[in-house]
């Protein structure tokens, strides 16, 4: 009846998905800031 593996059931829980999503978002921001520095900071005129 339940043929889903325990690892797949664990990986589809909300805290795990949220943690993975935050790591991906942080990685994108870090790499963007590495290749294009100072674009994330806009000083006031």
From Swiss-Prot:
Signal peptide: none annotated. InterPro entries: PSI_PsaJ, PSI_PsaJ_sf. Coiled coil: none annotated. The chain crosses the membrane at residues 10-30. Keywords: Membrane, Photosynthesis, Photosystem I, Thylakoid, Transmembrane, Transmembrane helix. Disulfide bonds: none annotated. GO terms for cellular component: photosystem I; plasma membrane-derived thylakoid membrane. NCBIfam families: PRK02733.1 (NF002743). Belongs to the PsaJ family. This is Photosystem I reaction center subunit IX. It comes from Mastigocladus laminosus. The lineage of its organism: Bacteria, Bacillati, Cyanobacteriota, Cyanophyceae, Nostocales.
């Amino acid at each position: 009846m339940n043929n889903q593996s325990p690892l797949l059931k664990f990986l589809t829980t909300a805290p795990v998905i949220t943690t993975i999503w935050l790591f991906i978002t942080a990685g994108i921001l870090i790499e963007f800031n590495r290749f294009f520095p100072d674009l994330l900071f806009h000083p006031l005129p």
